[in-house]
Amino acid sequence: MNRFIKSATSLKDCINDSKKEVCLIGRSNVGKSTIINGLANAKIAQTSKTPGRTVTMNFYEISNQRIVDLPGYGYARIKKSQKEEISLFLSDYLNHRKNLVGIFLILDLGVITDQDIEIVRLLTTLDVEYYIVFNKIDKYPKSAYINNKEKILDALKVNEDRILLISAKNKQNLNNLMLKIIDVIS
């Protein structure tokens, strides 16, 4: 059964069990919640055209796999105190959550920011498997993917096998993403 389980705003609020999980992290409005809905084939996550709507960690069960939708980073129109709070619990979750076995960084294919590059650098320091997922491939020409892929590969020495291409909106390649999630968790 595909379902929303719970929200959390700190590590102590997270589900307290030993089930393995993966998380989706990315800038605000990059499509993380849309990906959740696409993987579930149902609207179990709230989506919005307004960036910064997800301000909690949201736990879902999809195809018997636990997936956590993390708040987006980089949105400028929330209070500084709220930004700091989100940043703190994201850091706490990524560094200390024992259930976390995989991180999927969701990037907008057309726009790679310095903050995205910093997050990739952070992922390389964690003892958790990670993948870079370029979303919105339906919106951009192939040249955008080639340019941004090269930017990531060159700047960070990331292996190409860590990169996935999807369109959450059109559900393109979501099956490949789900297979990778299952592989990471098992």
Swiss-Prot record:
Alphabetically, which GO biological process terms does the record hold?
division septum assembly
Q: Which residues cross the membrane?
A: none
Please name the CDD domains in this protein's record.
Answer: YihA_EngB
Q: Which residues form a coiled coil?
A: none
Please tell me whether the keyword Nucleotide-binding is annotated for this protein.
Answer: yes
Record domain EngB-type G: where: 18-186
Identify the residues that bind GTP.
26-33, 52-56, 69-72, 135-138, 166-168
Keyword match Cell division: yes
Keyword entries, A-Z: Cell cycle, Cell division, GTP-binding, Magnesium, Metal-binding, Nucleotide-binding, Septation
Q: Which residues bind Mg(2+)?
A: S33, T54
MF-aspect GO terms: GTP binding; metal ion binding
Q: Which cofactor does it need?
A: Mg(2+)
The record's Gene Ontology cellular component field reads: cytosol
Q: Which family does it belong to?
A: Belongs to the TRAFAC class TrmE-Era-EngA-EngB-Septin-like GTPase superfamily. EngB GTPase family.
Stated role = Necessary for normal cell division and for the maintenance of normal septation.
NCBIfam families tied to this protein: GTPase_YsxC, small_GTP
Q: What is this protein called?
A: Probable GTP-binding protein EngB
Q: Which organism is it from?
A: Mycoplasmoides gallisepticum (strain R(low / passage 15 / clone 2))
